[in-house]
UniProtKB/Swiss-Prot annotation:
UniProt organism field: Schizosaccharomyces pombe (strain 972 / ATCC 24843) (Fission yeast)
Gene Ontology cellular component terms for the protein in this record: membrane
Membrane topology: Multi-pass membrane protein
GO terms assigned for molecular function: amino acid transmembrane transporter activity
Protein name as annotated: Uncharacterized amino-acid permease C460.01c
InterPro entries: AA-permease/SLC12A_dom, Amino_acid_permease_CS, APC_YAT
Keyword Transmembrane helix in record: yes
Length: 572
């Protein structure tokens, strides 16, 4: 056979037996045989489309068939804008109404500080163990199999429910323009999410890269505009200079209860920050990509959450009837701030940005739920058939189950009789999803503490790790403390609700996630009778990626210059 028009890659050298063929060669669509007979097999689009649904041929070193297709740019944009969505743009309205502007600024700052420590701990663990299931798999090994089982299902339920919840939010957001049946909008966005998932993790990464870029640009634009509005620089705004006149009126609405109630919605706003750890099994170079992504989280918290919400507190009164849950229409406080400045056209533009953000969070929710269910199957925490992965690296069965649950969003149709069922469902799901994040984030911190203690006890050097959290164990201790504090505050608000007496409905609506977690943990303990391993016997070697002298420092730098370099390296 002539080879003038076909050059063999190094993968084909010295192959003279069918059994010697690398599985990756088969996956590329080449015919097995001796070298002289190797030729590309041409397949039609239809044939290739259906072949992609067949079981994956090769697996990663951790036994997962997920493909490492996410690049550094994907991870950085996911870290910066991946969780900017309905929690910030819409959920902040109910936070402002319940707790007032001072409460929202303080609470979002506290949750932001907590997330700063959580994400750095997560970065260290994810670079060391870039495995399927992410931090849920790590918690199973380092904390307790029963607790790993609990938070894995807890995390899955979180995003499994968030998927139809965000579809519902899409329909609510469209009420700004029209009263068209919610089912129409739900159907459109459900189809969009299904199409994105059909193209695998690379499509998810590209879509998130584009949507996150748009969200970042829009939020920065709003910050600039909000400063101008507050200073009285908008000709159509007859209020003139606003300054701190609004925030002084009712800074802590509903007192201490209102202050505590903001924790749940703040947590929901920050949900998704941990995606960079969950995606570690699908990143092409975890040691390079993940540390950069982790460092971007600080800027997202500082700029996009703290600054934007501070400006919202300066511009919107907590008793405004148009805030989420107060009036007949639900308007984002971001859109409301532009409306009250009498700027024509721009509110519709920003409302479109909110819809883009909701689509992004919806897409991310399906990703998180499907990958978590796939990871649980690998640990034996879920039926084995959920581990099925096709040739595109899609956890196909897990993905289909999650997408099917999206049809639950059609419960909005029950509102035809004026029952307000969709609003009730939104409240219940928001409370469940928001509280469950504390369990996941607390587990990340606790896993990091145990990992560091075991790592030191077994005589290993941190210099061999690909990324070391500059916050160390103490940073994780602070993060864990904040998570426990948030759970206590939410328990108080659930037991003694704002403007009412203790009742079962409010308590379970606010603390249902804790009840579910207790049932799962006790149930697994009874079934498996798992135990907590000692630090000496804890398995930290399996799946651990070490890098010789990965944390080697420049010996020529010293003194103040060295300190500045360390600070810069921690945030940039």
């Amino acid at each position: 056979m002539s080879h003038n028009n076909f050059e063999l890659s190094p993968d084909y050298k010295d192959i003279d037996k069918k059994d010697d063929l690398n599985p990756s060669i088969v996956e590329k669509g080449y015919v097995e045989g001796v070298v002289d007979d190797v030729q590309p097999e041409r397949k039609s689009f239809i044939t290739k489309f259906f072949d992609d649904f067949k079981p994956a041929i090769s697996t990663d070193e951790d036994g997962s068939a997920l493909k490492r297709s996410l690049k550094a740019r994907h991870m950085q944009m996911i870290a910066i804008g991946g969780a900017i969505g309905s929690g910030l743009y819409v959920g902040s309205g109910s936070s402002l109404s319940d707790g007032g502007p001072a409460s929202i600024i303080i609470n979002y700052t506290l949750i932001g500080i907590m997330m700063f420590f959580v994400v750095y701990a997560l970065g260290e663990l994810s670079v060391a163990y870039p495995v399927a299931g992410g931090f849920n798999t790590i918690a199973t090994r380092f904390i307790d199999p029963a607790w790993g089982f609990t938070i894995s299902w807890n995390y899955f339920i979180n995003y499994f429910i968030t998927f139809p919840l965000e579809l519902t939010t899409c329909a609510i957001t469209f009420r700004f323009w029209t009263d068209i049946n919610s089912a129409a909008w739900i159907s459109i966005f459900l189809v969009i999410v299904i199409i994105i998932n059909l193209f695998g993790v690379r499509a998810y990464g590209e879509v998130e890269f584009i949507l996150s870029t748009l969200k970042v640009i829009a939020t920065l634009g709003f910050i600039i505009l909000a400063i101008i509005i507050n200073c009285g620089g908008v000709p159509t705004d007859h209020r003139g200079y606003i300054g701190g006149s609004i925030i002084k009126k009712d800074p802590f609405r509903h007192g201490f209860k209102g202050f505590c109630s903001v924790f749940t919605t703040a947590a929901f706003s920050f949900s998704g920050t941990e995606f960079i750890g969950l995606a570690a099994a699908e990143v092409d170079n975890p040691q390079k990509s993940l540390p950069h992504a982790v460092k971007q989280v600080f800027w997202r918290i500082a700029v996009f959450y703290i600054v934007s919400l501070t400006l919202i507190g300066l511009l919107i009164s907590p008793d405004d009837p148009n805030l989420m849950g107060n009036g007949s229409t639900s308007v984002s406080p971001f859109v409301l701030a532009i409306q009250e400045a009498n700027i024509k056209g721009l509110p519709s533009v920003f409302n479109a940005v909110i819809i883009i953000s909701v689509v992004s969070v919806t897409n991310s929710s399906t990703y998180a739920a499907a990958r978590t269910l796939h990871g649980m199957a690998g640990l034996g925490h879920a039926p084995k058939f959920f581990k099925y992965t096709d040739r595109l690296g899609r956890p196909l069965i897990a993905m289909v189950v999650v997408l099917l649950f999206g049809f639950f969003a059609y419960i909005n149709e029950a509102d035809k009789n004026g029952n307000d069922v969709s609003d009730t469902v939104f409240d219940w799901l928001l409370a469940l999803a928001g509280l469950s994040n504390f369990f996941s984030w607390g587990s990340i911190c606790l896993s990091h503490i145990i990992f560091r203690l075991a790592y030191k006890r077994q005589g290993r050097s941190l210099r061999d790790l690909g990324f070391v959290s500059p916050m160390g164990i103490w940073g994780s201790c602070i993060g864990l403390f904040f998570n426990i504090l948030c759970l206590m505050a939410q328990f108080y608000v659930s037991l003694f609700p704002i403007g009412g007496k203790p009742n079962a409905n409010d308590f379970f609506q606010g603390y249902l996630a804790a009840c579910v977690a207790i049932v799962f943990f006790v149930g697994y303990k009874i079934y498996d009778r798992s135990h907590v391993p000692s630090l000496d016997k804890l398995d930290i070697s399996t799946g651990l990626r070490t890098y010789e002298n990965s944390d080697e420092e420049d010996e020529t730098s010293s003194g103040f210059k060295h300190v500045l370099k360390k600070i810069y390296g921690a945030f940039c």
